[in-house]
């Protein structure tokens, strides 16, 4: 991106003028941001993201951040000699793995991001879905077709869960005190078992419960692409379902779009899939006329 020192004062004024109506639109609204992908491993990008979150809070927006951590979990498991298997895009999580997942997500990544935001002048609080029984989960189930027998079988994913209930008591208190919640995607069952939850799914459940103005899913790709690999800037739910059916939306993008649809059905006003590797992607989406990424709406 262009360095700020090369922008003329007049251009800087125009940028601020363009941002004003968007700031007014989001005044006192809640924005849930899922921060993930390999951009999390780049310190400069992570710190730029933290500054952007503080800017949102300073402009009377209520940001709630949910972070992932797949690459960092993989690195730690490899260091400890633990081999991971995946099924239907989800990490099969046994008893040994869930301990490492919780350590990396709730301990390392969460507190690092809290530190970056506080360093930038914000007041962030690091939590996971277990805190205050914020997010209850049920065991996730997936089916796969056996390549030899062609019979569909249920896959045991271990301690992988899906959100079942979100209690907003703690989140609403934090937002009311102008604190910035930073959430690791861990949850507990009603029996007290810890579950690893896909970060996109977790963010969608939280955004839906909060009836957020926007859910932003930061990923490693520019957004939803058409068959010629060009960005689709805007999609209705109906069109998104058509693109899944005809194979335009495929692979790992399918569960992301399904999360978007779920969040919209729960009351979120708009969901955007955008590239988290682009510095200030959140600001570009919220405060410019052209935005960035793919907006999905009803």
Curated annotation (Swiss-Prot):
The keyword Cytoplasm applies. This is Acetylglutamate kinase. Disulfide bonds: none annotated. It catalyses: N-acetyl-L-glutamate + ATP = N-acetyl-L-glutamyl 5-phosphate + ADP. It is found in: Cytoplasm. Keywords: Amino-acid biosynthesis, Arginine biosynthesis, ATP-binding, Cytoplasm, Kinase, Nucleotide-binding, Transferase. Its EC number is 2.7.2.8. Catalyzes the ATP-dependent phosphorylation of N-acetyl-L-glutamate. The record marks 34, 256 as: Transition state stabilizer. Pathway: Amino-acid biosynthesis; L-arginine biosynthesis; N(2)-acetyl-L-ornithine from L-glutamate: step 2/4. Substrate binds at residues 69-70, 91, 196. One of its GO terms (cellular component) is cytoplasm. Pfam families: AA_kinase. GO terms for molecular function: acetylglutamate kinase activity; ATP binding. InterPro entries: AceGlu_kinase-like_sf, AcgluKinase_fam, ArgB, Asp/Glu/Uridylate_kinase, NAGK-C. Belongs to the acetylglutamate kinase family. ArgB subfamily. GO terms for biological process: arginine biosynthetic process via ornithine; L-arginine biosynthetic process. Its main location: cytoplasm.
């Amino acid at each position: 991106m262009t360095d700020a020192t090369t922008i003329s004062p007049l251009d800087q004024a125009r940028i601020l003028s363009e941002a004003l109506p968007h700031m007014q639109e989001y005044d006192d609204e809640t924005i849930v941001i899922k921060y993930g992908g390999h951009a999390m491993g780049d310190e400069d990008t992570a710190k730029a993201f933290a500054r952007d979150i503080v800017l949102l809070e300073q402009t009377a927006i209520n940001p709630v951040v949910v972070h992932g951590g797949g690459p960092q979990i993989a690195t730690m498991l490899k260091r400890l000699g633990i081999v991971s298997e995946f099924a239907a895009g989800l990490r099969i999580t046994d008893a040994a793995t869930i301990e490492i997942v919780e350590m990396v997500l709730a301990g390392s990544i969460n507190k690092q991001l809290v530190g970056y935001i506080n360093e930038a002048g914000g007041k962030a609080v690091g939590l996971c879905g277990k805190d205050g029984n914020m997010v209850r989960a049920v065991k996730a189930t997936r089916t796969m077709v056996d390549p030899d027998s062609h019979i569909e079988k249920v896959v045991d994913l271990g301690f992988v869960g899906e959100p079942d209930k979100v209690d907003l008591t703690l989140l609403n208190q934090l937002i009311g005190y102008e604190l910035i919640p930073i959430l690791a995607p861990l949850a507990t069952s009603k029996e007290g078992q810890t579950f690893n939850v896909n970060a996109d799914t977790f963010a969608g459940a939280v955004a839906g419960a909060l009836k957020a103005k926007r859910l932003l899913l930061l990923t490693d790709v520019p957004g939803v692409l058409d068959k010629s690999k060009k960005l689709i800037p805007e999609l209705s739910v109906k069109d998104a379902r058509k693109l899944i059916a005809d194979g335009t939306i495929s692979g790992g993008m399918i569960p992301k779009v399904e999360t978007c649809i779920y969040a919209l059905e729960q009351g979120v006003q708009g969901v955007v899939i955008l590239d988290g590797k682009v510095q200030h992607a959140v600001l570009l989406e919220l405060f410019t006329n052209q935005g960035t990424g793919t907006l999905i709406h009803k």
